[in-house]
C-alpha cells in the first residue's frame, strides 16, 4: 500500500489541522513501512475539542431516546457494510492478521454499539413514596463531556467499547487513540458523522499519550476519563484526573492471568484453551492467561500437546486468509518482549520452543517474535511476575488445589482467570476463590457486549460493557416533591 495522506484531527464533524505543528509517524509492523504522518493534538486543540463537544452534547442530550438510538444503529449498519475495508486498515496499522481483524475487531465493536443503542430507552429514573403528600423521583442525566484514551492492541474495538455507552447515555466523547495505532479511530469518527451524530459529539485527537492524554485528564471541562493501558500509565491518569477536577474514571489495565488445568481435564481441550489464551493476536491481549498451571504428573503430556499445536501456527503474509499469527505492534514493543525472553533464559526457565525473532523471507523487516513457551518456571521469575504482552507462555506445575489457588492469587494483578476441569463442583468452588474480575470455565477470551469486564486489584477500576457501564456514564439527580403546605420552624 502506498503512503497515506497526512492525517489530521477530527473536531466538530470534520478534519482540521493541529495547532501544535507537531507530527508523528505510524508504521506497518509487518514490514517496517511508514503508513502515514499523523498530526499531534496540543493543548489548544484539546480546548477546541472540549468547546466543540460541549456544544454538540447539548444538542445530543436534547434528542429523544429513540432518536439517539436510531443514529447509533445507523452507525452500526455502516460499520458492518465497511467491515472489510476497516479490517484491512486495522491490519496495516496493527500488524494483526486480516483473518482476525475481519472477523473480530470491527464485528465485536459493532455488536457493542448495537447493544447500547438498544439500551438507550431503558435509562429510567425511579419514584420513591415518602408519605401521602410527598415523594421523590430520580433522573439519570448525562455527565457531559467525557474522554476516552485507547490502547494500541484493539484500536477500533476499544474506541467503540468506550464511545458506545458514553454516547448512549447522552454524553459527548473526545477520544485519543494510541499514537502507535491511530488510524481507524479517525474512520470511526467519519462513520458517526455520516450516521447523523451532531457535530462535536465524537471528536478524535491523535497525539502522544504523555502530552495529549495529560491535557485531557487535566482539563476542567471533562467529567470522566475512561482509560485502557498499562498499570503505571493508568495510575498517572487517575492521579491527574482527581487532582484537576475530581473526574470519574474507568481503568482497564494490565494482567498476568492464571489458567489452571486440573488433573481431570481433557488435556486436548486444555491445550487448545492455553494456545488461545497466549497466542491469539500474537499474545497482545490484556486478559491473556500467561501463567499456565498444570498438575506435575500431567506436565510432560501437556508440553507435547502444546508443541503439537505450536506447529499449527501460521505466520506470514498478514493478508493471507490462512495466516493466524502476525508481528508485534511495533519495533520498540518487539524489543521489550525480547528483553523479557532473555530474562527468562537468564533466570533458568527452559525454552520449550521459540525464544527469538522469526527469521527468513517476509520476516526480516518486521517486528516478528516467534511463539515462545517456557517450562520449568517458578513463581518468582520475572516472566511469571510481570506482564509481557507478547507471545510468551509460562508453564508452572502444582500438587494440590489449595496450593494452586494461593499461587494464582499471588499477584498485584486481577484482570482475568480461568480453569479447565470436568468437575462442575470444583469449577465453581475454585473460580469463586480466584481474585479476578473476568473468569472463564472451560473456555477463554470471549467478552460479549452483555458481559461486564474489568479487573480486581491493580488491573483496574470500573467495568466496560454490560448494563452497569451505561449507568456509569450518568449521574443521578434526586428531586423531592411536597404537595402539602410547607411548614417552617421560623
From Swiss-Prot:
Task: Give residues annotated as binding NAD(+).
Answer: 150-152, 176-179, 230-233, 254, 286, 387
Going by the UniProt record, its keywords in alphabetical order are: Metal-binding, NAD, NADP, Oxidation, Oxidoreductase, Potassium
Where are residues bearing Cysteine sulfenic acid (-SOH) located in the sequence? 286
Give the reactions, separated by semicolons, that this protein catalyses: betaine aldehyde + NAD(+) + H2O = glycine betaine + NADH + 2 H(+)
Query: What EC number(s) has UniProt assigned to this enzyme?
Result: 1.2.1.8
What start and end residues bound the annotated signal peptide?
none
Query: Which amino acids does the record list as binding K(+) 1?
Result: 26-27, 93, 180
Output the HAMAP family linked to this UniProt entry.
Answer: BADH
Q: What is this protein called?
A: Betaine aldehyde dehydrogenase
Amino acid at each position: 500500500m502506498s503512503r497515506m495522506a497526512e492525517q489530521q484531527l477530527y473536531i466538530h464533524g470534520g478534519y482540521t489541522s493541529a495547532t501544535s505543528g507537531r507530527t508523528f509517524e505510524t508504521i506497518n509492523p509487518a514490514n517496517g513501512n511508514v503508513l502515514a504522518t499523523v498530526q499531534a493534538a496540543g493543548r489548544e486543540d484539546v480546548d477546541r475539542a472540549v468547546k466543540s463537544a460541549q456544544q454538540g452534547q447539548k444538542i445530543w442530550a436534547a434528542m429523544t431516546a429513540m432518536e439517539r438510538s436510531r443514529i447509533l444503529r445507523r452507525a452500526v449498519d455502516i460499520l458492518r457494510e465497511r467491515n472489510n475495508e476497516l479490517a484491512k486498515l486495522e491490519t496495516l496499522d496493527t500488524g494483526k492478521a486480516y483473518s482476525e481483524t475481519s472477523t473480530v475487531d470491527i464485528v465485536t465493536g459493532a455488536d457493542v454499539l448495537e447493544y447500547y443503542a438498544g439500551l438507550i430507552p431503558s435509562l429510567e429514573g425511579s419514584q420513591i413514596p415518602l408519605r401521602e403528600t410527598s415523594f421523590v423521583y430520580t433522573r439519570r442525566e448525562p455527565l457531559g463531556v467525557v474522554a476516552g484514551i485507547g490502547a494500541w492492541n484493539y484500536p477500533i474495538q476499544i474506541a467503540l467499547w468506550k464511545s458506545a455507552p458514553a454516547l448512549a447515555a447522552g454524553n459527548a466523547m473526545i477520544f485519543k487513540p494510541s499514537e502507535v495505532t491511530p488510524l481507524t479511530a479517525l474512520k470511526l469518527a467519519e462513520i458517526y458523522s455520516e450516521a447523523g451524530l451532531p457535530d462535536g459529539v465524537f471528536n478524535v485527537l491523535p497525539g502522544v499519550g504523555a502530552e495529549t492524554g495529560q491535557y485531557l485528564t487535566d482539563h476542567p471541562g471533562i467529567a470522566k476519563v475512561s482509560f485502557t493501558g498499562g498499570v503505571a500509565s493508568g495510575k498517572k491518569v487517575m492521579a491527574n484526573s482527581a487532582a484537576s477536577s475530581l473526574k470519574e474514571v474507568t481503568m482497564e489495565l494490565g494482567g498476568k492471568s492464571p489458567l489452571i488445568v486440573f488433573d481431570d481435564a481433557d488435556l486436548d481441550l486444555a491445550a487448545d484453551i492455553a494456545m488461545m489464551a497466549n497466542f491469539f493476536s500474537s499474545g497482545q491481549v490484556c486478559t491473556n492467561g500467561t501463567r499456565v498451571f498444570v498438575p506435575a504428573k500431567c506436565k510432560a503430556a501437556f508440553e507435547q500437546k502444546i508443541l503439537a499445536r505450536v506447529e499449527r501456527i501460521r505466520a506470514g503474509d498478514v493478508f493471507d486468509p490462512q495466516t493466524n499469527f502476525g508481528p508485534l505492534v511495533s519495533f520498540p514493543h518487539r524489543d521489550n518482549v525480547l528483553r523479557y525472553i532473555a530474562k527468562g533464559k537468564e533466570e533458568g526457565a527452559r525454552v520449550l520452543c521459540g525464544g527469538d525473532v522469526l527469521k527468513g523471507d517476509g520476516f526480516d523487516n518486521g517486528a516478528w517474535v516467534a511463539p515462545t513457551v517456557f517450562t520449568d518456571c517458578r513463581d518468582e521469575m520475572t516472566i511469571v511476575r510481570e506482564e509481557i504482552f507478547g507471545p510468551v507462555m509460562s508453564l508452572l506445575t502444582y500438587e494440590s488445589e489449595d496450593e494452586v489457588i494461593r499461587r494464582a492469587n499471588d499477584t498485584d494483578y486481577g484482570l482475568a482467570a480461568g480453569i479447565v476441569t470436568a468437575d462442575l463442583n470444583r469449577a465453581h468452588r475454585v473460580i469463586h476463590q480466584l481474585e479476578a474480575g473476568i473468569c472463564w470455565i472451560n473456555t477463554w477470551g470471549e467478552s460479549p457486549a452483555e458481559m461486564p469486564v474489568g479487573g480486581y486489584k491493580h488491573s483496574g477500576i470500573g467495568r466496560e460493557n454490560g448494563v452497569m457501564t451505561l449507568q456509569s456514564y450518568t449521574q443521578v439527580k434526586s428531586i423531592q416533591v411536597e404537595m402539602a403546605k410547607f411548614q417552617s420552624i421560623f
